[in-house]
Amino acid sequence: MGKEKVHINIVVIGHVDSGKSTTTGHLIYKLGGIDKRVIERFEKEAAEMNKRSFKYAWVLDKLKAERERGITIDIALWKFETTKYYCTVIDAPGHRDFIKNMITGTSQADCAVLIIDSTTGGFEAGISKDGQTREHALLAFTLGVKQMICCCNKMDATTPKYSKARYDEIVKEVSSYLKKVGYNPDKIPFVPISGFEGDNMIERSTNLDWYKGPTLLEALDQIQEPKRPSDKPLRLPLQDVYKIGGIGTVPVGRVETGILKPGMVVTFGPTGLTTEVKSVEMHHEALQEALPGDNVGFNVKNVAVKDLKRGIVASNSKDDPAKEAANFTSQVIIMNHPGQIGNGYAPVLDCHTSHIAVKFAEILTKIDRRSGKELEKEPKFLKNGDAGFVKMIPTKPMVVETFSAYPPLGRFAVRDMRQTVAVGVIKSVEKKDPSGAKVTKSAAKKGGK
């Protein structure tokens, strides 16, 4: 057995008709763990419905439909393998909740694959003011997705077909936009592909022999290996809490940073409740240590289920334990709010697993969202497209961290009127010291608080 491949998460972004589903479907289809029988079934159904052209996207549509109906889809279907990596595709963003998911992040993407429609009119629609190409790229950068691959898709449908001139034009325009967002376009491969015909997806295409760079598969292999934050202090936001007969209270969540081990004394923020971890399990197997990215359940001593809930964060009591945030200052980008946002605005913040109303106590500055330069001190309001620094006060106890120290706990979506109105990253946090929090006997014995 060779060394196991590294897992990476990829988010596929781009305008609605750019061919995201077809391209992703193609990769999963050719490189993924989809059972041949399943594919044959899909193909047969697609043929019966005269959807031949939709073959790859159809695979993805079927998966999405099954997932949305709550059929537990074998998540291997959203995975594919390159020579170097196991890749998982994070929610493809046709989804209304995509932005929220990308931020509250069931997983942080290591690389964004930006799909561009190269056809006449298609490219212009995607990159226009209202197109999603810009918004997705800006979001990816703001949320810390540092690496990007650009695919100039539908090269089989340019005029003339496989046009180098069209490719050059797109590379030039997209590069200048990505540079404004904050990416370095010299570090981004621009791969001309056809997600439908398969040109340059996996093998080199003779139709594009003027192009000398990597295929999409090779570009994915050139992604820099992500550093997992296991050396940081523990942060594990709870997703759920169960009471299991004969075992007791079992909180469940994903280790975002640090390491969780049996015998560790953990402090839950914002309450300050401190106790010992008896055991840690993943997929019904006992673990000696859980690392970032692991979804685990862990059993805690002498803690009632009612004392824990979703949004609470487990941390190591001896290593920068999680505390309640009295207030925090964030850099916010207003994305889709119909009016003006002024001091006193109180929407809901989705940050890690918590979902709490927060007051915009004070808009400190308005800034240029690309350069970060200050445009105005203490503006009266922010509106669509504006960015600014805002001091926020939670309406209930909550744990947040700075984006620089603990990225998954330092980015958030602002929700109002059933949509994401803004996104942000946290720059500084003023924390409260817990007073009178319960410390269980076993924790006290171990020299906890």
From Swiss-Prot:
Main location: cytoplasm
Region (G3): 91-94
Region listing for G5, in residue ranges: 194-196
Binding site for GTP: 14-21, 91-95, 153-156
In-chain residues carrying the UniProt-annotated modification N6,N6-dimethyllysine: 55
Entry's Gene Ontology cellular component terms: cytoplasm
Similarity section: Belongs to the TRAFAC class translation factor GTPase superfamily. Classic translation factor GTPase family. EF-Tu/EF-1A subfamily.
Subcellular locations according to the entry: Cytoplasm
Function: This protein promotes the GTP-dependent binding of aminoacyl-tRNA to the A-site of ribosomes during protein biosynthesis.
Descriptive protein name: Elongation factor 1-alpha
Molecular function in Gene Ontology: GTP binding; GTPase activity; translation elongation factor activity
Keywords: Cytoplasm, Elongation factor, GTP-binding, Methylation, Nucleotide-binding, Phosphoprotein, Protein biosynthesis
Positions carrying N6-methyllysine: 261
N6,N6,N6-trimethyllysine sites (modified residues): 79, 187, 306, 396
Alphabetical list of CDD domains matching this protein: EF1_alpha, EF1_alpha_II, EF1_alpha_III
Chain positions covered by the region annotation G1: 14-21
Pfam family, one: GTP_EFTU
Region feature (G4): 153-156
tr-type G domain location: 5-230
Annotated stretches, region: G2: 70-74
Sites of 5-glutamyl glycerylphosphorylethanolamine modification: 289, 362
Organism: Manihot esculenta
